[in-house]
């Protein structure tokens, strides 16, 4: 006898959809969002925290997509690499880190150069300037005299023109410590692409590896000149400041701790079978990354991954249930790698579908992005009736919010709201349950206190709405179910497990946000199990 179609639990992550009461420069409040407005007023909802200590970051530190999806999938507050590495800098254990000490010794023995590559920013999302300064202190202790710094400017997780202040602070630290020189400057648009736009990576790669003379300007002077031409930090073209190309026998430390935007440049610098663009592989090359960017990379790792056991995807798979993940290119690693606690490979019964993001320079040129195709894919998966858990990410609020273009962000929000309506129809047809939330804020705050475009994330809370269909038009429980206040992203996985009627493992320290005294569970839910 054929199994009955499954009534899925669907987690919809509206990336960058924060909550802020003021409507000024608030793309979410200014957009026409009839679907979300109806859900917010008609169904159980609450606000949850996505920043600072609530997600394993320092107090007051804005959340981000990597951190958000880690916490969402893990069902616990995950101590973040930012804190882990900052502690190592502060307590001086960085100076004894085996991978870092060894590469310094190799460079010293070969009398070659040590290159430090990474985002020069105090944004705390991909890196932190204090970590770079800690590496300079390490180089001094290891008596290195050829330390080349390849600055990547931010302008995305910080104000658009904050780079000059970060570089000035770096130049001051170089002078104080007595080690290092800035040899290149590049905006993250080029050096940290993650969407396989290899022409961008190649521009940074060529500047890093080719012998080109500087023109006598300092790094701050170069940045000022770009500002004069209305080119902000993110888009600074790769520029040689001083001699110091990466050559055979050198050592490289990539000090970004977040993997997704560091991988492509590392592939180009280290992988023998790299095919993104034509280049001659530099060998030998000692290479250390702060964290594990990709297990396939032929590099040493300074801070090995933390093992996360009994995360949501693992629990669902162990119960023999099927699950589905989909997102477009920009957020695909987040619903797979990060949601699975840093594991590349899917769990048994976990299917995935990647949707290509539009090939545009910046997403304000295409604010709809690929949301419609993501929705088509998700609806098809839901209506197959075989998946107990479906995880979907809509990238628009975050990726368009990062451009600082308010009108485009409003269009992005309206696109996602329309897609939600279609998605809810499919979920209703299957009698499923949907949880709608976000990983962090962004699009609700589009200008800073001075009225300038704000392109970074926020520390604002995000919505959580739960809607359970019972064979009607998504009526749900209405007022019969409450959602607890003061929740965190870590509480989402336990909430999903409670709806699926699966036990919460002890490693999950989050709590279900469904108030127990009001909990109503459909007793006829029929999960589809994988045959063994």
UniProtKB/Swiss-Prot annotation:
Mn(2+) 1 binds at residues 398, 402, 457. Binds 2 manganese ions per subunit. InterPro entries: Alkaline_phosphatase_core_sf (IPR017850), BPG-indep_PGM_N (IPR011258), Metalloenzyme (IPR006124), PGAM_B_sf (IPR036646), Pgm_bpd_ind (IPR005995). Mn(2+) 2 binds at residues 15, 65, 439-440. It holds the Pfam family Metalloenzyme. GO terms for cellular component: cytosol. Pathway: Carbohydrate degradation; glycolysis; pyruvate from D-glyceraldehyde 3-phosphate: step 3/5. It catalyses: (2R)-2-phosphoglycerate = (2R)-3-phosphoglycerate. Its EC number is 5.4.2.12. Its cofactor is Mn(2+). Belongs to the BPG-independent phosphoglycerate mutase family. Monomer. This is 2,3-bisphosphoglycerate-independent phosphoglycerate mutase. It comes from Rippkaea orientalis (strain PCC 8801 / RF-1).
